[in-house]
C-alpha cells in the first residue's frame, strides 16, 4: 500500500498494511516551530528554513525529508500554496531562532510584546514577553446584545476574528472565480506530486466562532439566556458557510481525501454542553454542512477537529454525518480508549489518541513513551478505523528524542 491507500483503508474500516501516521497533516497534529527547529538539528538536517504557517499556534510546515523520516501518510492541502520565496518574510521565534512567516501577516512589536493586527489596524492577538503563542485580545461583538442582532454583518466581522483573519496558507485565498481557479490548480499539482493522503481544512465552525466574536464566557452565558438568538446565529453561520463550501469543494474536492471541519465541543471534564443542547443548538446545522459536503464529494471523508471529552456527543455526531475526528483527547473524562473503540470503532474513525501529550510525551523516558504508544495503538488500530497522531500538537518544549521515540514506537 502507498500512503493514500493506507489512510483510505483505515477510514473505510479495513485493516491497512501498517498503522497510518499523521504528522503535521492539519493544525492539531503538528509541531511548534521551536520544537521543529530542535528536531531538525537532532536529525542532522541543516538545509531549509523554518516556515511558520500558523501564527497563533506557532506551527511549522513539516518538510518532506522529515515526513519521510517519521513515515507520515498525510499532508495538508495548504502546502500547495505560498510556494515562492516572495510569499514569506523574515521573523524570529521567541527563542531567537530565525524563521519565515506568511507575507500577508500583519505583525508589530511594541516594547517586548508582539501583536497580530487586522488589515485595518485592530490588534487581534498578542504574544507577550516570555510566552510562546498568541492569544486573542479583540472580540468584535463583546458588547453586543445577541437578541437585537440579525447577523447580517457576519462576513464583515469575520475579518476581525483572530482565527479567521489570520488564515493559514490556502485559507487566505478568496472564493472568487479566480481564487477557486488557484485553489484547484494548487490542489491538482499537490495530488500529482504526492502519494500521501491529502487533508483539506474548511472550518465551518458553529460553536467556536460565536466565542471568537462575543468572548467565550459571554457566549456560553447567552446559550442559557438567549436560546433562540443562538439558534438563529447557528442558522446564519450555516447560511454563510454553505456557498463557500460548495465553491471550495468544486475546486479541491476531486483532489483531496479528507475535509476537516472544526468545533471544540468538549473540555477536560466532558462536553461544554449537554447532549440535548447539542441536538438543539448545533446538530441540525452541522448535519446540513456535513451531508452537503458528502453529496458534493462522496469519496471524501467527513472529519471534525473537536477537542475535549466529547464521548456523550459521539452518537449524535455520527448521526449528523461525521465519519472521523481528531485529536481524541484520551486524558479527558469519558475518553477511555477501550470504551471508545468498543462502542464506536465499527462506525467511526479515531484520528489521534496515539500518545499522551499532557504527561508522557513531554516528560516521559523513551521507554515510557514507547509503552504508551504501543498500548494505545494496540487498542485503536485493530480492524482499521484508526489514524495515528499524538493528542494535539507537539509543544515547544518537547525534546526531539521523545518525538522520535514516539514515531519509532508506531513503526514497531
Predicted regions and their residues:
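Ligand-binding clamshell of periplasmic/extracellular solute-binding protein-like
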Residues: 23-26, 59, 74-84
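Outer-membrane beta-barrel proteins
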Residues: 52-59
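Residue-level detector of functionally special positions within alpha-helical transmembrane segments
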Residues: 2, 71, 93-96
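Aromatic-residue-lined binding/catalytic grooves and analogous aromatic/hydrophobic interfacial grooves
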Residues: 68, 76-78, 83-84, 96-104
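Catalytic domains of carbohydrate-active enzymes, especially glycoside hydrolases
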Residues: 59-77, 252
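Active-site loop segments of alpha/beta catalytic cores
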Residues: 1-41, 45-52, 135, 139-412
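Non-catalytic, alpha-helical, charged scaffold/linker segments
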Residues: 89-142
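Short helices/loops that flank or line small-molecule/ion binding pockets
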Residues: 61, 80, 315-317
Amino acid at each position: 500500500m502507498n500512503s493514500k491507500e493506507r489512510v483510505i483503508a483505515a477510514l473505510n474500516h479495513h485493516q491497512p498494511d501498517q498503522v497510518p501516521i499523521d504528522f503535521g497533516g492539519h493544525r492539531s497534529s503538528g509541531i511548534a516551530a521551536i520544537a521543529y527547529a530542535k528536531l531538525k538539528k537532532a536529525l542532522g538536517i541543516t538545509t531549509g528554513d523554518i516556515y511558520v504557517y500558523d501564527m497563533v499556534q506557532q506551527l511549522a510546515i513539516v518538510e518532506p525529508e522529515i515526513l519521510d523520516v517519521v513515515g507520515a501518510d498525510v499532508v495538508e492541502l495548504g502546502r500547495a500554496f505560498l510556494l515562492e520565496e516572495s510569499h514569506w518574510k523574515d521573523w524570529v521565534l521567541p527563542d531567537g531562532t530565525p524563521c519565515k512567516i506568511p507575507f500577508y501577516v500583519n505583525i508589530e512589536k511594541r516594547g517586548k510584546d508582539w501583536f497580530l493586527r487586522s488589515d485595518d489596524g485592530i490588534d487581534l492577538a498578542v504574544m507577550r514577553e516570555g510566552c510562546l503563542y498568541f492569544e486573542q485580545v479583540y472580540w468584535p461583538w463583546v458588547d453586543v446584545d445577541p437578541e437585537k442582532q440579525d447577523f447580517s454583518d457576519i462576513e464583515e466581522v469575520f475579518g476581525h476574528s483572530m482565527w479567521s483573519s489570520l488564515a493559514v496558507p490556502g485559507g487566505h485565498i478568496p472564493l472568487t472565480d479566480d481564487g477557486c481557479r488557484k485553489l484547484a490548480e494548487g490542489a491538482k499539482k499537490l495530488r500529482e506530486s504526492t502519494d500521501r493522503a491529502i487533508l483539506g481544512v474548511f472550518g465551518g465552525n458553529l460553536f467556536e466562532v460565536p466565542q471568537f466574536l462575543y468572548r467565550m464566557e459571554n457566549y456560553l452565558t447567552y446559550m442559557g439566556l438567549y436560546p433562540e438568538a443562538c439558534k438563529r446565529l447557528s442558522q446564519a453561520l450555516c447560511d454563510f458557510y454553505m456557498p463557500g463550501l460548495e465553491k471550495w469543494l468544486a475546486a479541491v474536492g476531486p483532489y483531496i481525501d479528507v475535509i476537516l471541519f472544526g468545533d471544540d465541543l468538549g473540555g477536560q471534564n466532558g462536553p461544554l454542553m449537554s447532549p440535548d443542547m447539542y441536538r438543539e443548538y448545533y446538530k441540525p446545522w452541522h448535519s446540513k454542512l456535513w451531508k452537503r459536503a458528502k453529496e458534493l464529494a462522496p469519496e471524501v471523508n467527513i472529519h471534525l477537529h473537536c477537542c475535549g471529552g466529547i464521548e456523550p456527543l459521539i452518537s449524535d455526531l455520527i448521526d449528523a454525518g461525521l465519519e472521523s475526528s481528531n485529536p481524541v483527547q484520551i486524558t479527558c473524562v469519558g475518553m477511555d480508549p477501550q470504551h471508545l473503540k468498543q462502542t464506536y470503532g465499527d462506525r467511526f474513525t479515531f484520528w489521534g489518541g496515539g500518545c499522551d501529550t499532557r504527561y508522557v510525551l513531554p516528560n516521559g523516558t523513551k521507554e515510557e513513551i514507547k509503552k504508551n504508544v504501543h498500548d494505545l495503538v494496540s487498542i485503536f488500530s485493530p480492524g482499521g478505523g484508526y489514524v495515528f497522531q499524538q493528542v494535539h500538537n507537539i509543544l515547544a518544549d518537547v525534546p526531539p528524542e521523545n518525538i522520535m521515540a514516539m514515531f519509532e514506537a508506531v513503526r514497531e
